[in-house]
């Protein structure tokens, strides 16, 4: 009997493979994206110190209305503004094993437009 692969397990495997190749430093931290069915979360992480430097998600009060893609744009804008306020201008983009399409792409484009370089 053929079993259908679990999409999330395949994504996690892809994410582990990519994470082995990229890491965030204090000079160039990692912009991590997590996408759930209902929301999207973004963190700017310094992997050397193991510290989250800035974050934004659909749980924030500023992000409440609109479609999921519109919310992703607002989250990208917020995380970029918070990172730039802390003096971070360059990051390494970690798409979390997700395809660079839809909400993930919308978040990345909004972060670029608001001052983050990657």
Swiss-Prot record:
Lineage top rank: taxon: Bacteria
Q: Which Pfam families match?
A: Ribosomal_L18p (PF00861)
The Gene Ontology terms for molecular function here are:
5S rRNA binding; structural constituent of ribosome
Regions of biased composition (Basic residues) lie at 10-20
Q: Which residues cross the membrane?
A: none
**Do the record's keywords include Nucleotide-binding?**
no
Sorted keywords for this record are:
Ribonucleoprotein, Ribosomal protein, RNA-binding, rRNA-binding
Q: Where is the region Disordered?
A: 1-25
InterPro entries registered for this protein in UniProt: Ribosomal_uL18_bac-type, Ribosomal_uL18_bac/euk
Similarity comment: Belongs to the universal ribosomal protein uL18 family.
Job of this protein: This is one of the proteins that bind and probably mediate the attachment of the 5S RNA into the large ribosomal subunit, where it forms part of the central protuberance.
| Oligomeric and partner information | Part of the 50S ribosomal subunit; part of the 5S rRNA/L5/L18/L25 subcomplex. Contacts the 5S and 23S rRNAs.
* UniProt protein name: Large ribosomal subunit protein uL18
Q: Which gene encodes it?
A: rplR
